């Protein structure tokens, strides 16, 4: 998981939760074509979109980062 690119992680978590691209688009307010482009790596999501995707997948945005931390509070410190 740590070696996966963001586009691979978006697809992985979406499939793990058995969500279609259309449903993820509805949950996030991001156009379904944009979700598709993120998943195949044509576009990279900006931080705001990544947060919306994380919320739509019901995960922490930290899941998309290739870093290891003890907890989210460590990001602020």
Report each predicted region and the residues it spans:
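Short basic helix-loop element that most often maps to the first helix and adjoining turn
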Residues: 8-27, 52
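DNA major-groove recognition helix of helix-turn-helix/homeodomain DNA-binding modules
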Residues: 48-63
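Short, charged recognition helix plus adjacent turn
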Residues: 63-77
């Amino acid at each position: 998981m740590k070696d996966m690119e963001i586009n691979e992680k978006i697809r992985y978590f979406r499939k793990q939760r058995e969500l279609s691209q259309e449903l993820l688009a509805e949950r996030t307010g991001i156009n379904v074509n944009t979700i598709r482009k993120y998943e195949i790596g044509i576009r990279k999501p900006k931080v705001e979109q990544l947060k919306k995707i994380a919320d739509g997948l019901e995960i922490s945005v930290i899941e998309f980062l290739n870093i290891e931390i003890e907890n989210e509070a460590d990001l602020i410190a």
